[in-house]
From Swiss-Prot:
This is High affinity immunoglobulin epsilon receptor subunit gamma. The modification Phosphotyrosine is found at residues 65, 76. The keyword Disulfide bond applies. Belongs to the CD3Z/FCER1G family. The chain crosses the membrane at residues 24-44. The lineage of its organism: Eukaryota, Metazoa, Chordata, Craniata, Vertebrata. It comes from Sus scrofa (Pig). It is found in: Cell membrane. IgE Fc receptor is a tetramer of an alpha chain, a beta chain, and two disulfide linked gamma chains. Associates with FCGR1A; forms a functional signaling complex. The signaling subunit of immunoglobulin gamma (IgG) Fc receptor complex. As a homodimer or a heterodimer of CD247 and FCER1G, associates with the ligand binding subunit FCGR3A to form a functional receptor complex. Associates with CLEC6A. Interacts with CLEC4E. Interacts (via ITAM domain) with SYK (via SH2 domains); activates SYK, enabling integrin-mediated activation of neutrophils and macrophages.
Length: 86
């Protein structure tokens, strides 16, 4: 695909040399526009793949609290109040 693009650009350069100044700008603008569209599509595709991978990895785990267990001992213990000797 890359050699085809290079060949196309070389053909456009020969034609562009024969064109006037405004027409050359239009050709360059079209190339930049297509380049921007391709980059935008690749960026969106990458974002969707990363998001899908994150969702898949989240579904594989049991949840946020994986590995935690309940304690057998109560958190709060009652204090034994003893009267001081008199």
């Amino acid at each position: 695909m890359i050699p085809a693009v290079v060949l196309l650009l070389l053909l456009l350069v020969e034609q562009a040399a024969a064109l006037g100044e405004p027409q050359l700008c239009y050709i360059l603008d079209a190339i930049l526009f297509l380049y921007g569209i391709v980059l935008t599509l690749l960026y969106c595709r990458l974002k969707l793949q990363v998001r899908k991978a994150a969702i898949d990895s989240y579904e594989k785990s049991d949840g946020v609290y994986t590995g935690l267990s309940t304690r057998n001992q109560e958190t709060y213990e009652t204090l034994k109040h003893e009267k001081p000797p008199q």
